[in-house]
Amino acid sequence: MNQELTNNPFNPLTPPKAFDEIKVSLASPERILSWSYGEIKKPETINYRTFKPERDGLFCARIFGPIKDYECLCGKYKRMKYRGVVCEKCGVEVTLQKVRRERMGHIELAAPVAHIWFLKSLPSRIGLMLDMTLRDLERILYFENYVVIEPGLTDLTYGQLMGEEEFMDAQDAYGADAFQANIGAEAIREMLSQIDLESEANQLREDLKEATGELKPKKIIKRLKIVESFLESGNRPEWMVMTVVPVIPPELRPLVPLDGGRFATSDLNDLYRRVINRNNRLKRLIELRAPDIIIRNEKRMLQESVDALFDNGRRGRVITGANKRPLKSLSDMLKGKQGRFRQNLLGKRVDFSGRSVIVTGPELKLHQCGLPKKMALELFKPFIYSRLEAKGLSSTVKQAKKLVEKERPEVWDILDEVIREHPVLLNRAPTLHRLGIQAFEPVLIEGKAIQLHPLVCSAFNADFDGDQMAVHVPLSLEAQLEARVLMMSTNNVLSPANGAPIIVPSQDMILGLYYVTLAREGMKGEGMIFADVDEVRHALDAGEIHLHSKITARLPQIDEEGNEIMVRFDTTPGRVMLGALLPLNAKAPFDLVNRLLRKKEVQQVIDTVYRYCGQKESVIFCDQIMSMGFKEAFKAGISFGKDDMVIPDTKWTLVEDARDQVEEFEQQYMDGLITQGEKYNKVIDAWSKVNDKVTDAMMGTISASKRDENDAEMEPNSVYMMAHSGARGSVTQMKQLGGMRGLMAKPNGEIIETPIISNFKEGLTVLEYFNSTHGARKGLSDTALKTANSGYLTRRLVDVAQDCIVRMDDCGTENTIKAEAAVNDGEVVASLAERILGRTAGEDVFIPGTDEIIVAKGELIDERKADAVEAAGVTTMQMRSPLTCEAEEGVCATCYGRDLARGTKVNTGEAVGIIAAQSIGEPGTQLTMRTFHIGGVAQGGQQSFQEVNVDGKVEFRNANLLKNANGESVVMGRNMVLAIMDDQGSERASFKLGYGTNVLVEDGKKVVRGDRLFEWDPYTLPIIAEAAGTAKFVDLVSGISIRDETDDATGMTQKIVSDWRTAPKGNELKPEIIIAGEDGEPMRNDQGNPVTYTMSVDAILSIEEGQTVKAGDVIARIPREGAKTKDITGGLPRVAELFEARRPKDHAIIAEIDGYVKFGRDFKNKRRIGIVPADESLEPVEYMVPKGKHIPVAEGDFVQVGDYIMDGNPAPHDILAVLGVEALADYMIDEVQDVYRLQGVKINDKHIEVIVRQMLQKWEIQDSGETTLLKGEHVDKAEFDSANAKAVRDGRRPAQGEPILLGITKASLQTRSFISAASFQETTRVLTEASVQGKKDRLVGLKENVIVGRLIPAGTGGATQDVERIAKGRDQVVIDAAQAEAEAAAALAAPVMEDAAPDTDAAE
């Protein structure tokens, strides 16, 4: 019988079919019939009294199979022995009940019906095929109009629509047989079947060659694409209209009797019943020869019911069930979070899992977790049963069960055995990155809570305020091995996002270590000298010295040769104790811990130990400093009371000063010297300056060291220790407790002018409290919204990057990108060493001025090399990047460089795309969850000057300065750069100077740190006269292009340029100010162009008409945006916007060529800016700019490629088109990093590069040449290359194309894998498109493989696949050799037996 079972066709033991790809295409009626086991003729389901399926109904046993295993419906045949017999009484085959999950039926439709997906999913495929609009199609399908199919010799045209009346008239006029017209899906089906695809395609190609204009070729290309896809896939157009509807197996749409005689049923049964009822009624009406109008109505209803079955609600009203709930159609089963893809295929529930609350387990080792005995007993049951049986304690599973239930003592012993060395996985939701699931060895504990090691909390982002975690048991040996080798917490010391240690002490431990490493003057035992660690320990225990005394001690160290030597250090007993834990290594000297350790330094220590002392040592070290930190923090007994918050004495004088200032600004505003906006900005500035001063004063008071009566230094202030060490709290929080709360933000990000002067210690007034609720509430609502947004961003990132895997070792490309230090506002935010660390050099790097190589080309740069490059004074170098990698699929290990989480070169098969997505997505959620901690206190405040932070010499580049009447130098150019050079002549800092900046230093002048270089007005953009003369106003007409704004508060009026385009006669105006000379003619500037200034909307005029103007005077001011608060809330949408590659609203315009600016004729409400190229051979280019926008260039200005002709955020597409891939990558990396840096989050650049690579995978065809590619089509780079290579081989003209940038959502939907795209978004659209094209999914990415239930082709799954591939290749070699041998033998045999020659052929 066992033999029988294994051969059973429905037995899971049969090996699954091996397949390499999945193809989806349209099903022909014959195909549907071949799947079907019979036609369903009745709408009945089951008999409600006997619960037996009705014959020929939707659950019919004859069609779908028996309801009980090996038993026919009437009960004549039972048991295995009748397997495969068909009962002659009830017609049921005797077999397993499971076949009801896989046998399909069908419904023969009495009239054809159009498939709604191909009709309504835009663009309508049927419409494209027939070249008809969707509206016309619907009119035919839903029986409103006739369509001419065969005009004959009449003067009707093919495809013409006619109403009932027209049709009758035409029949009367031409006779009934002179032409053919029809209505409904039959007509459409007939038209589709008449299409000859080949000739249609040729015809369209001809049309395409002759087509002109913008829209026509586009339409032809769309049609050509669909015709070609039908040709290629072997689908027939008429299959888009169905004559047979398949019925899915009944077990997939179950009907379950509930108690009380009611039934619970799947919605599909209702939908199918509708279809069957209408179909049967239609059949009857046709037999009865009912009037046309009735039949037509029934056909229309049949069409509607089939539409509802396939996609309910896509057309017409939604069909609802008894409880007014819309019925779930077949499409809804696939779509969305609850659909088949995301609910059941990509996310499954797991057995052998449990969850419980977590508590801290400080006495655990790093690789352990505490597992409650109760949980362990339940999770490891099968293991315990088998062990009990093996030990002979029970003979059956039942007996073992009883033993376990009684919890006999031997069971606990066995549990201990089972658990030993069997890792379990712990997971905390939300799992934002791969460190959210880690493996630990369980330690059995009493109680019901899981114990978690404190050091891994930051990786899980866990705390012990009631968080829960889930436990999973890896069952198979392979799973245990992977858990131990890859997922063990000890193997995940470094963060995959930035390569820094993530197993870092926090909070109490940091406070303890900080306290241990404090050094204080005048403590007991100061100046004592100790011979070794033991003496120090002894003295401490005896109380002869204090933990913080300054002493000298002799400690063992390792010198460069690796010998142990004793070295004397000036240190403290606390530091000696900590130093004793440090592994002995030349690279980890005692100096590492011989300093005050704050959080950052502790991280540095762990990093160094991990890098140089190996994993084992560093894990032990981490555990030891953790317990030391806890112990010392506990012994120190640090706590604080309200007197520890010190309010500085100077606070009130500072506040009074600020109040005076603010009053002065109010007065200036009343007098009309400044505008409302300027006053607001100045007030905010004044208050934020005061706030900073008060904070500084407070910090000064708190951090000052105090002495007691014995002149010994006292312990620092507790609050200060906590904040300074990085254990908890920040200066901002201390400021609110002891300084002043400062300015608050409104929910929309604006800052409220009146600050909160009180702090929490003094207590807020009622008004202040009310003001502060604003920001606090915004913080809370933000948190809720942002979490969702951030999760969605991560999901899109994962989807776009999921098939980016390391596939090869080296692609051998010569392409590289440039690496240089990231400078922000003249401050180095990321040094060159940081940026090249863990990357592959793309060129030999020399010490400047010599030919000595520091790093050879193709070498992986480690910490030592990176520091050497930086020390040698190299400022830029070329490095390999995933962006420029030429691997066909995925990326290569050399371009990617170091695997950040391991510190070694990345392994083949590493899923770097997903790691990149997680690294970018995870902090998004983190940060957004943490906005509200500061309670909406305004951060930011505008800077209006730049100080230099290095010593050096000033150097101007592209200088364009003008001295104004006050003798200040004003920048007049667009691309002036001020650089600070050191003595060797290398650049230390550089600043881009905006138009209107006042420069305070001379070219070539020496500056020292802290000097002011230049200043600017942060709130307005000035327009400055470049020549002296008289001001003449042109088209500045009061009431049309100028409004006089009288300020209610001050009674002063200002002239402000208003939007003249809205005024009745405004369209022709071109408001500008001309500087005229003595003769009334406009002055000319150096280039010989007239000096005119075009005014933009909202500019405030600073001069009157006819006034005499000196060079450098401000003519008008354009207000900039007010100071908004900076917060990742603004940041997260910014990151999403960058990755979605959206064009910003008022995006900058980038010059495409070098040349001179020339203004052309204005056009409606746009201004035309042209660039006349410097290079004669190029065509001039023109840009249209909305009128009234400020244009920073003037007539005749010389612009270079990449200069902004209009200010704003550039659109990434433009950067790609004008400046190329590398510039785009730089822009994306800088912008994304700016957002994260603001929050102090470090992310390695390569993650962003990987995502940008995925966004750049498609090429847009500019000219199709003589290939099959079509103009405007988006194809993969690989496809583009192969098509071109083929064309070149055949001597045809290759296609031209250029890379395009797709946003992450779009890129995900355009992946080669339709399964992956369908499971992401817009499922119906993706599947419709795929089936028309007959797409094949080659299962390369991760998602497709998860969905079809395979191991993913990454990591260990990738390794097994490689082995299989190699084995297959070797098999093939053997087969080929055997075949060749046979052929050779045949060839030898052939000449002898000449008659038999044809036979040998046949034999072969």
Curated annotation (Swiss-Prot):
SUPFAM superfamilies per the UniProt record, alphabetical: beta and beta-prime subunits of DNA dependent RNA-polymerase (SSF64484)
Residues at which Zn(2+) 1 binds: C72, C74, C87, C90
Amino-acid positions noted as binding Mg(2+) in the UniProt annotation, renumbered to this chain: D463, D465, D467
Top EC category: transferase
CDD domains per UniProt: RNAP_beta'_C, RNAP_beta'_N
Cofactor note: Binds 1 Mg(2+) ion per subunit.
Metal-binding listed as a keyword: yes
Any single biological process term in GO: DNA-templated transcription
Co-factor(s): Mg(2+); Zn(2+)
Pfam family, one: RNA_pol_Rpb1_4
Molecular-function annotations in GO: DNA binding; DNA-directed RNA polymerase activity; magnesium ion binding; zinc ion binding
Protein keywords: DNA-directed RNA polymerase, Magnesium, Metal-binding, Nucleotidyltransferase, Transcription, Transferase, Zinc
The EC number(s) this enzyme carries: 2.7.7.6
Keyword Transferase attributed: yes
Catalysed reactions, semicolon-separated: RNA(n) + a ribonucleoside 5'-triphosphate = RNA(n+1) + diphosphate
Role according to the record: DNA-dependent RNA polymerase catalyzes the transcription of DNA into RNA using the four ribonucleoside triphosphates as substrates.
Family membership noted in the UniProt record: Belongs to the RNA polymerase beta' chain family.
The protein, known as: DNA-directed RNA polymerase subunit beta'
Source organism of the structure: Jannaschia sp. (strain CCS1)
